Curated annotation (Swiss-Prot):
This is UDP-N-acetylglucosamine 1-carboxyvinyltransferase. Belongs to the EPSP synthase family. MurA subfamily. InterPro entries: Enolpyruvate_Tfrase_dom, Enolpyruvate_Tfrase_sf, MurA_subfamily, RNA3'P_cycl/enolpyr_Trfase_a/b, UDP_GlcNAc_COvinyl_MurA. GO terms for cellular component: cytoplasm. Its EC number is 2.5.1.7. One of its GO terms (molecular function) is UDP-N-acetylglucosamine 1-carboxyvinyltransferase activity.
């Protein structure tokens, strides 16, 4: 495990190209289990989590080739019903292969998921939904076993919370339940779910309603091979936009879908940022100290929780007091203590953080606690006086393709240093 050494005080300027969305690619890769024919996915980011999912697909009988950003997936052997624990523990999205394997083979056994440690992520929503679709569920010794027992004509699943993972998992599983109509109420509405629907429908699925709170899936008998391009990563785009604004710079962010970031753009503009949108490119300029704004995270189309830590780093140097309310992951404030080490003035009470803007942050040794928190610390390091050393930095490589290279091309002074044994 290495660390990032960041020389602060740089102004970011230039162009940056946004990669394909990890959060769209992973569920689409899981959905490829539904098909025997070759799937070709384009615009796939080369990230640690993607490589874990590749290993999972290979372990259950699929041939996978990954060349640059193109992924080819085809079933080669009988689908294995069990996924090795050492793969599942690395990433929570791997749990979403449970339903697809079970619907293909009648049974699946998958370890309870790992991944980001930002509070409890119950898989109960997934399991209750699978039960309603006719699967029996057994949980013991850290594993979940799903066995298909009965087919039902009509199923309605109302999610207690619009969980992205549960929505994707249940959609994908239901797509191959021939003769069953599944309705998911209070579904998550994220763009990545629309992307998953579009992919499954291209394979021959019959899903409608993604992007709204009600998704209807008519199960089909089989899927066919397709070629499909993954949407751009809205969180990566937002991260670079915040970083450029925080450094009081100017840049062009390319390969963005602006419709996916409307709420975020509004908040940036409230701080004084100038934004211009040209098709799938966004020009940003910020030369002043930002104005404080209040931010409340909510499920899409609200302000994304995955951009809250980066926004907090930015608002830590704003003029005035910002109130940040976290409504999605209640414990998503692990970055606060690290930002305070750099001189930020932040107080947390429950799911609310009060951020009193300071003139400057100071470089300090800090520790990454999860993917987005580490991105926030990187932004803080870029705008701070002096040198910031971020340890436990491997998180960032799970969600940002070529992150050091992209930031360096914008003018950031960042070096990855291997930890000495």
């Amino acid at each position: 495990m290495g660390k990032l050494v960041v020389q602060g005080g740089t102004v970011l300027e230039g162009e940056v190209e946004i990669s394909g969305s990890k959060n769209a690619a992973l569920p689409i890769m899981a959905a490829a289990i539904l098909c025997d024919e070759e799937i070709i996915l384009k615009n796939v980011p080369r990230l640690q989590d993607v490589f874990v999912m590749i290993d999972i697909l290979r372990s259950i009988g699929f041939r996978v080739e990954f060349d640059e950003n193109e992924l080819k997936i085809k079933r080669e052997n009988d689908i294995s019903q069990e996924v090795p624990y050492e793969l599942v523990r690395k990433m929570r999205a791997s749990f979403n292969v449970l339903g697809p394997i079970a619907v293909r083979t009648g049974r699946a056994k998958v370890a309870l998921p790992g991944g980001c440690s930002i509070g409890v992520r119950p898989v109960d929503f997934h399991l209750e939904g699978l039960k309603k679709m006719g699967f029996s569920i057994k949980v013991e010794h850290g594993f979940v076993e799903a066995t298909f027992e009965r087919r039902t004509d009509q199923v309605t699943i109302t999610l207690p919370f619009p969980s992205v993972g549960a929505t994707e998992h249940l959609m994908t599983t239901a797509a191959l339940l021939e003769g069953t109509r599944v309705v998911i109420e209070n579904a998550a509405m994220e763009p990545e779910i629309v992307d998953l629907q579009n992919f499954i429908n291209r394979m021959g699925g019959r899903i409608e309603g993604a992007g709204t709170s009600r998704i209807v899936i008519e199960g089909v008998e089989k899927m066919q091979g397709v070629e499909y391009s993954i949407i751009p990563d809205r969180i990566e785009a937002g991260t670079y936009l915040v970083a450029i604004a925080a450094s009081r710079g100017k840049g062009l962010v390319k390969n963005v879908n602006p419709d996916h970031l409307t709420n975020f753009f509004e908040k940036l503009e409230e701080t004084g940022v100038k934004l211009k949108v040209f098709g799938n490119e966004v020009e940003i300029e910020m030369r002043e100290r930002p104005e404080a704004v209040d931010v409340t995270t909510n499920p899409y189309p609200g302000f994304p929780t995955d951009l809250q830590p980066q926004m907090m780093a930015y608002l830590s140097i704003a003029s005035g007091v910002s109130v940040i309310t976290e409504n999605v992951f209640k414990t998503r404030f692990l970055h606060v203590d690290e930002l305070k080490r750099m001189g930020a003035d932040i107080e947390v009470s429950g799911n609310v953080a009060i951020v009193k803007g300071v003139e400057k942050l100071s470089g300090a040794p800090v520790e990454g606690t999860d993917l987005r928190a580490t991105a926030a610390l990187l932004i803080a390091g870029i705008i701070a006086d002096g040198v910031t050393e971020i340890s436990n930095v491997e998180h960032i490589f799970r969600g940002y393709e070529d992150v050091i290279d992209k930031f360096s091309k914008l003018g950031a002074k960042i070096e990855y240093v291997e930890k000495e044994n």
